[in-house]
Amino acid sequence: MRYRRLGRTGLQVSELSLGAARGASTDPERFKTTVHAVIDAGINLIDTAESYENGVSESVLGEALVGRHDVLVETKYRPYDSHAPDANYTGSPEQLVASVEGSLRRLCRDRTDILLGHGIRSLATLDRFMSDGCYGAMVKLREQGKVRFIGISELSEGDGTHQVLQRAVPSGAFDVVMLTLNFLLQTAADAVLPLCQQHDVGTVVMMPLNQASKSSGLVSVPAALECVRRHVAAGNLPAEPPYTDPGLLDFLQPLSIPEAGLRYVLAHDVSTCCVGMQSPQRLQENLRAVDPSYLDPATLSRLRELFGRIQLQVR
């Protein structure tokens, strides 16, 4: 496993990090086995949230991490009433503090390494988050030692051109951002990553293999071609060759679609690529993507030529 610097936090994080959104409630023992295998493979950052499986993700993760202080944990506070793009903003500093206290109890930790405002999806709600006391509460928690570093994550389903992060990163308010980047939504490569480099903000990439549904995406050739078909149907891509060709993605061989997807992300100047791994078998598949190289310039150029115009996720 190779490691990269997480911006001005100075933390060294593994190129792959574990997204723990799913699996804890359906099979907690397998979830814990996977967490242990992930750590043994050298992965040292795990992402979770209070809203993942109604706190079960944090609780089972906390059980898995008992006695393991060499692992960085990132959790999140969602200031909305749901994950939907049109969810109502319900954030308050009191709720944020209560959320973090609950997360720490479930995680069996005195502090979390990274706290993110979860899924900030519009400039209007970013402004509210910054002015209604929520951001101030994050800063106070950091001063109290309950949080080491603070940041926000976006919701690319409603902000595919990353307007929120383009405002947030230069503000200097955040140490870390979580953003969407995959070869079917490449806009962050130009819109956000240069700003993060300029302002020394750590970058955690989410959804490297998913589209907006989070239930399908870049997991196989048929699934990836189905995503392309949906982009064509939505008018994001033209209904003509090569997008209608069954061999559209043959140029990625001999890599599997997940390997190519992860290598695409890691070919960029990001800190870590956060990916779900619900079994040790999926972990081994993902590890192949970081050994030994990233995508070559010609393949990156072809992916950009084919899909660089897409500006929204599809369900």
Feature map (PLM): residue ranges:
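A general structural detector for well-ordered alpha-helical segments in enzyme core domains, enriched
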Residues: 2, 34-35, 57-64, 99, ...
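N-terminal binding-site loop/beta-alpha segment at the start of enzyme catalytic domains
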Residues: 1-75
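Local beta-strand N-terminus motif with an aromatic residue
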Residues: 13, 43-46, 70-71, 112, ...
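Conserved, mostly hydrophobic/aromatic
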Residues: 6, 18, 46, 61, ...
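Glycine/proline-rich, positively charged
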Residues: 29, 36, 40, 85-191, ...
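Generic structural signal for helix capping and beta-alpha/helix-loop junctions
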Residues: 25, 55, 81-83, 124, ...
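Active-site beta-loop-alpha junctions enriched in small/polar residues
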Residues: 21-23, 49-51, 76-80, 117-120, ...
